[in-house]
Swiss-Prot record:
UniProt protein name: Benzoyl-CoA reductase subunit B
Entry superkingdom: Bacteria
EC number: 1.3.7.8, 1.3.99.n1
Assembly: Heterotetramer composed of A, B, C, and D subunits.
Organism, scientific name: Thauera aromatica
Keywords attached to this entry: Aromatic hydrocarbons catabolism, ATP-binding, Flavoprotein, Iron, Iron-sulfur, Metal-binding, Nucleotide-binding, Oxidoreductase
Reactions that this protein is recorded to catalyse: cyclohexa-1,5-diene-1-carbonyl-CoA + oxidized 2[4Fe-4S]-[ferredoxin] + 2 ADP + 2 phosphate = reduced 2[4Fe-4S]-[ferredoxin] + benzoyl-CoA + 2 ATP + 2 H2O; 3-hydroxybenzoyl-CoA + AH2 + 2 ATP + 2 H2O = 3-hydroxycyclohexa-1,5-diene-1-carbonyl-CoA + A + 2 ADP + 2 phosphate + 2 H(+)
Length: 432
């Protein structure tokens, strides 16, 4: 970024708040030796943060550690370390970055060593790799492990039997393990209070995501959206901090709508909205800003994305319900995006295309992420057929810098935007 653009960098109150929250959680994690707090490692989809807080345990999420290392340009060497130790090139790079991080002293972003987990909680919501990842972690740390088995929505619906099965596991396996490891007795009223906070924050998050229906969209629901979902999908859902963060964020977006502004980018306000896109798949983290710049330089705004639903489909009506504490945790896990079948995913993308008046669909296929990438070409063709809008396919990776080609992605995006322009011209001639 040039010196001329530096003064335009915008730091809003919500950004500062989120940065403080993340830094505070890492300080809490790396300070558990002094505080005596217990640590549980879990994953983002199906993350039961409200339940974890009931036992005064600190939540550590290995994916977010890999993302942090990716954005700090540190994951490449960690991945190569893991491959030298025998992990295949095809294995999820989150896993390899985590394994490599452990081999390098398991240093957190604050420069201090991460603690060993006292417990592993695997909420299985459709990603088979998570199971193998936790087998590696269990072998490394030899700590108590509990798996919450979440039935797959093969038929595209959640049944009473599925819900009852998850609640039964929570009562008979998960909660007793938490009590045993933490030494804290489960208090369902405490859980209810956290769930109330969650529902309030979820309302504001959904409002923010749906603000992209405006023209111009005041947000980028993919590149900006990954920041907006951060507190909700990680160690903060259910906290007063999350409620405050989403309240601040909503207020800022309301102001942008009043002023007719587009999204904030790393180089200031986006000046012109030329293309409205729906994006399927996670972003590339190692070249995140470079990747984003390829979009906003062309006036392309992502108005809806599937990745920002990986930790919960709140915009489809789900809210945590304090009146049914364990049942609502089951519903949450069952409804995560990666636990939906392909027809459900296609229907969601089609809905986004229509509701957000998108010009087209873009799929960012991740080389090492099978839970997202499987079936994406099929999904792309189906969306083209249903909507008549152009779709495109690019390939990158999560946190492996070897699989981000700036020139290749740039060429594909430029060709795609030309295709969108041609489609618009054809539509204009047809109606003339």
């Amino acid at each position: 970024m040039s010196a001329k653009t530096n003064p335009e960098v915008i730091k809003e109150s919500s950004m500062v708040k989120q940065k403080e929250m993340i830094a505070g959680n890492y300080d809490r994690l790396t300070g558990t030796k002094e505080s005596g707090e217990k640590v549980v490692s879990t994953f983002v989809p199906g993350n039961l943060n409200e339940l974890i807080m009931c036992f005064d345990m600190v939540n550590n999420l290995p994916e977010t550690n890999a993302i942090q290392n990716g954005m700090r340009k540190q994951s490449g060497g960690m991945i190569m370390d893991a491959e030298k130790a025998g992990h295949s090139e095809d294995v999820c790079t989150y896993v390899k970055a985590d394994i490599g991080m452990m081999g390098r002293g398991n240093i957190a972003p604050n420069g201090k060593p991460m603690p060993a987990p006292d417990m592993l909680l695997l909420s299985y919501t459709g990603c088979f790799t998570f199971m193998k990842w936790f087998e590696l972690l269990r072998h490394e740390y030899k700590c108590p492990t509990v798996m919450l088995q979440i039935p797959y929505q093969g038929d595209g619906k959640i049944t009473k039997n599925m819900r009852d099965f998850v609640v039964k596991q929570l009562k008979e396996e998960v909660i007793p393990m938490f009590e045993q490891v933490s030494g804290v007795k489960f208090d369902i009223d405490r859980l209810r209070e956290y769930l109330k906070n969650s529902a309030k924050a979820e309302d504001d998050l959904v409002w923010v995501l749906e603000s992209a229906k405006n023209r111009p969209s005041p947000i980028d629901a993919y590149f900006g959206g990954v920041y907006y979902i951060g507190p909700m999908f990680t160690a903060f859902r259910g906290t007063a901090d999350a409620v405050e963060y989403y309240g601040l964020l909503r207020g800022e977006i309301e102001q942008r709508i009043r002023e007719g502004k587009g999204p904030i980018t790393p180089e200031g306000d986006m000046k012109e909205e030329k293309y409205r896109l729906v994006v399927e798949g996670p972003p590339n983290w190692t070249s995140f800003r470079e990747f984003w710049k390829l979009f906003y330089d062309e006036g392309a705004v992502v108005v809806a994305s599937s990745y920002t639903k990986v930790g919960g489909l709140y915009d489809q009506g789900f809210r945590h319900d304090p009146n049914d504490p364990l049942g609502t945790l089951a519903d949450y896990c069952l409804g995560c995006y990666t636990n939906n079948n392909l027809p459900q995913r296609v229907e969601l993308l089609e809905k986004y295309m229509n509701e957000y008046q998108a010009d087209g669909l873009l799929i960012n296929s991740i080389k090492s992420c099978n839970s997202f990438s499987a079936g994406q070409l099929l999904m792309m063709r189906e969306i083209e057929k249903r909507t008549g809008k152009p779709a495109a396919f690019i390939e990158t990776d999560l946190v492996d810098p070897r699989y981000f080609s700036h020139a290749n992605v740039k060429n594909r995006l430029e060709s795609y935007f030309q295709m969108v322009d041609q489609k618009r011209s054809g539509a204009s001639l047809a109606t003339a």
